[in-house]
Amino acid sequence: GTYDEYMFVCTDIDTANDSIHPEFQGSIDSGSNYNVAMTTTYFIAGHYEDDSSTIFGYNTGLDQAQGTVDQQFSYNQGSGADESGSGIIHLFAPASTTYVKHFYSRFISNGADEIARDNFCAGYFNTTSAIDAIRFKIDSGNITAGTFQLFGIS
């Protein structure tokens, strides 16, 4: 890889369905398979739109312990005009063939349940093979709008 750090900037991601979860996963075979084992942690800070409550906590249902499924980086995103999401994912040394590949993300979204969420995810791809492709998707339906940008950081 050209850079030791890559930053994915996701802006105004909107979806066709309510209550979806944007996800990502890496590949070590140029995108033929997206199933690299990863260990992750996930927590959320949130505030209800009607000011009735707040939330903050570790979400055990969104972390992985050597899981090979796609990792969520936003939770329960809605499809309404005021329910898009934006955020950043950092990936470190994906071309390394010596070390595991660390990442972290922060994603802001408004949910179908009218909760503004600040989503934090961190972890690592447990492989010493180079990560040579990243896939972004949602768990149901289609992404209908938004911009995904990739920046290399020296």
Predicted regions and their residues:
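Surface-exposed molecular-recognition determinants
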Residues: 1-154
